[in-house]
Amino acid sequence: MAGLDLPFTAVNIDADESYPAYLQAGDIPYYISRAKANAYAPNLTPGQLLITADTIVWLDGQMLGKPHDETEAAAMLRALSGKTHQVYTAVTFASITNEQSSMTNNQQSVSLETIVDCTDVTFAELTDDEIDYYISKYRPFDKAGAYGVQEWIGYIACTEMKGSYFNVMGFPVQKVYKMLKKYKKSA
């Protein structure tokens, strides 16, 4: 958001990030992003716009989330090595609507709108030394798929990308900006 020259306040949201096992690919971050928005929704006030996001890496029908330790991070990077995977990011926009209902005892309701973006990323073959170096230096335990495209691994491993670079970073800013213009018009 700072790169868009827009004022914002970051908030920590304590949300359950588990999801139903039947969800696949882009449905997973969609579900989690909305769960984050719903967790914070009681704190929203009229005129506020909450933006939540979630990103996953999808490889061969499997979701790669954030690794818990070095062993799991190395296994993820070995799996990505020499292959094409998808990065899905869902972004949810939450705001108070003006509609009131007798069913909600005249409480204001929250409107949620979610977009999902997908980028195909191809990795070069990685050596064990490269994987070990990256994990020890960059500690990618807070990153889906155990990598940050903006870090060293992105420079040496990402050989091809179809879609938004910013989506791979975890926030598809072009699509978010387009949505923000829509919200500005309706305000």
Region spans (language model):
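Short loop/helix-cap segments at secondary-structure boundaries that form the rim of catalytic
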Residues: M1-L4, P20, N43-L44
